[in-house]
Amino acid sequence: MKLVIFDGNSILYRAFFALPELTTSNNIPTNAIYGFVNVILKYLEQEKPDYVAVAFDKRGREARKSEYEEYKANRKPMPDNLQVQIPYVREILYAFNIPIIEFEGYEADDVIGSLVNQFKNTGLDIVIITGDRDTLQLLDKNVVVKIVSTKFDKTVEDLYTVENVKEKYGVWANQVPDYKALVGDQSDNIPGVKGIGEKSAQKLLEEYSSLEEIYQNLDKIKSSIREKLEAGKDMAFLSKRLATIVCDLPLNVKLEDLRTKEWNKERLYEILVQLEFKSIIKRLGLSEVVQFEFVQQRTDIPDVEQKELESISQIRSKEIPLMFVQGEKCFYLYDQESNTVFITSNKLLIEEILKSDTVKIMYDLKNIFHQLNLEDTNNIKNCEDVMIASYVLDSTRSSYELETLFVSYLNTDIEAVKKDKKIVSVVLLKRLWDELLRLIDLNSCQFLYENIERPLIPVLYEMEKTGFKVDRDALIQYTKEIENKILKLETQIYQIAGEWFNINSPKQLSYILFEKLKLPVIKKTKTGYSTDAEVLEELFDKHEIVPLILDYRMYTKILTTYCQGLLQAINPSSGRVHTTFIQTGTATGRLASSDPNLQNIPVKYDEGKLIRKVFVPEGGHVLIDADYSQIELRILAHISEDERLISAFKNNVDIHSQTAAEVFGVDIADVTPEMRSQAKAVNFGIVYGISDYGLARDIKISRKEAAEFINKYFERYPKVKEYLDNTVKFARDNGFVLTLFNRKRYIKDIKSTNRNLRGYAERIAMNSPIQGSAADIMKLAMIKVYQKLKENNLKSKIILQVHDELLIEAPYEEKDIVKEIVKREMENAVALKVPLVVEVKEGLNWYETK
């Protein structure tokens, strides 16, 4: 007899991120549902279980977060496109007659652990189907775990048993929580012991059976490891508790409840037809499939000849699809004239082709530049990038992987791509480009692609290649200072509290604040008192311990997020960090940055800003920082055509003081700093569709006062109100909004019946044309500055772009001409009804330029 338990959340998440973006003709997202159903069917057919269940997380105050508020804090919220698919998954499971088991406040792993614990001694063979390795701790003589991953509609599995887990994972099943207690788990934000890596942890658990035994034998462990263990003891045991699956939830489930039952084929058929899952309907033999029409898939991939490319003269076509194959470290080119796929690893030959008059159609051109390690891109021409073209058409896609683009734009059969991915992909590139070009023309996006996004590619490539120098010694010193401040704060907090406690534990902190120190309770959760940032800010002046706790949280974030991450990112050869600028990473058109993310370097608090001191130029160079002044408000003035706003910017009036004067009904000379501060919050808040609640919270006034403030603002700036209302209406009528340069952002939930979702969508609609236009202007400016630096044969390089700020590393003797160039080109990037103003500063580190 066999029981199969599916980890619903894990399988669903992995299907969503692994599969291309799929939607029905009614725009229902379906990729996660499709992948999930295929996994369920595969293992129902393969395992033929007598009993079956699907475990899901269930919202509620999470038990682990009650102990450690940062647990999974690094996880992004569930994407909207995944959220809307969950009800369909549940409907399908009901139609399959598969029980859904969940328990409020606990994760699917805990439900699985409790089911295993309840039934493992009943003689059953138990198979756990999941996408992650957390459940390996549940392995037993009759319990196996199959780790599955989805690629298109193919499911790949990795089988773990109690016998092979040590060989494959490095520790025994019952040591998995101990292992995570030592090394941590980045995906769940489990801290572990600082400085203990995988090999050290495995060695320790080879010698000692558990975390407890390790700490009982500290005197036998070499000093370098022992010191780390001693310093991280509290975090180690906290991490073990977080990593240990709960196996005693009172699920109130009987084995008979899980018995495999007949499917409700009629209901199953209805749902699958609604989701347009033709292949699954056919696979299940559901009878009425012939009544429904589906779009014909394009599978007409020609048989092609394959040859080694030896000379550019072999190419006859005027347009050549060209792609880099990572696994083989070589390039594939398709010549339609001779119906030949040419293959080469000769980088000089590829560089020659990129410089030729032939039109090259590629995917991810910037990556190809990196593979060729080009010194410069001056003579590269006639290159098209389908990834960037697809981003221009839809900046809200969840994936820009090549296969997903084939499916979305060519309706290509997934199987056709899979049969010979490299050959099929390079052959289809030309078709894909033709379709994208047609849509770009249809949507009037030519300027956005040809003058902004495509010419930005070489700019970003050279920025990534150049990198940003980091003073490693200064960073290490700064890290030590932060660590010392944390230790000092801990000591002060414990002295005031009169006892040691885990400051990171909301439960223990709430006991100290609200029970021991008797501070007023601001907010409660299901499991106790809230200690979130909003609560602590309200308690700031109520007790001396509260500011210390806020400082402690600030410094620990600086340490873990910035100091430690940055140290690891320094290239040992160049002494610089080489971030990746992601051109397709945001819905607004802004650039994103990763590995490391240099766009989230702190700007909000003084101590965090100090980390900018470690970013320095090379010797004999200086950093030049150019920052647009109030660009989003200037764009708002331009788009709304509000006369008062336009007049203020044209006459170089302090816009925040003018707004304060208008709203408070005083002369501009009589505006107090407090009035200006409140007006500033309104000015910037309006751009983001701020509500009276949000404004009241931000400037600490009553909600009624905030509403009056906003109403007065709109009375004085009526065309701003008119613009915002018209923009929301346009979004509701069309499903998208546009920037000044025709960048389109689709707005989900703009017609939602859920008030919160609709309100959020309306705020996005208000802000996106403004923020997106600012991003487009910055990109135009970057291109112009880059070109002028080249034209003047200057050695200066653009090294970073963060929101409204551009940073250039210039030899000292070039700094004056560079400052002139950057100010002129940025201020004249585009002509608006108001002037663009750029503030230019210089310094010997990034901090000095601000």
UniProtKB/Swiss-Prot annotation:
PROSITE patterns: DNA_POLYMERASE_A (PS00447). Residues 470-850 are annotated as: Polymerase. InterPro entries: 3'-5'_exonuclease_dom, 5-3_exonucl_a-hlix_arch_N, 5-3_exonuclease, 5-3_exonuclease_C_sf, DNA-dir_DNA_pol_A_CS, DNA-dir_DNA_pol_A_palm_dom, DNA/RNA_pol_sf, DNA_polI_H3TH. Gene3D superfamilies: 3.30.70.370, 5' to 3' exonuclease, C-terminal subdomain (1.10.150.20), 5'-nuclease (3.40.50.1010), Ribonuclease H-like superfamily/Ribonuclease H (3.30.420.10), Taq DNA Polymerase, Chain T, domain 4 (1.20.1060.10). GO terms for molecular function: 3'-5' exonuclease activity; 5'-3' exonuclease activity; DNA binding; DNA-directed DNA polymerase activity. Disulfide bonds: none annotated. Keywords: DNA damage, DNA repair, DNA replication, DNA-binding, DNA-directed DNA polymerase, Exonuclease, Hydrolase, Nuclease, Nucleotidyltransferase, Transferase. Its EC number is 2.7.7.7. It is an enzyme of class 2 (transferase). The keyword DNA repair applies. GO terms for biological process: DNA-templated DNA replication; double-strand break repair. Pfam families: 5_3_exonuc (PF01367), 5_3_exonuc_N (PF02739), DNA_pol_A (PF00476). Residues 1-288 form the 5'-3' exonuclease domain. PANTHER family: DNA POLYMERASE I, DNA POLYMERASE NU. In addition to polymerase activity, this DNA polymerase exhibits 3'-5' and 5'-3' exonuclease activity. Belongs to the DNA polymerase type-A family. This is DNA polymerase I. It comes from Caldicellulosiruptor bescii (strain ATCC BAA-1888 / DSM 6725 / KCTC 15123 / Z-1320) (Anaerocellum thermophilum). The gene is polA.
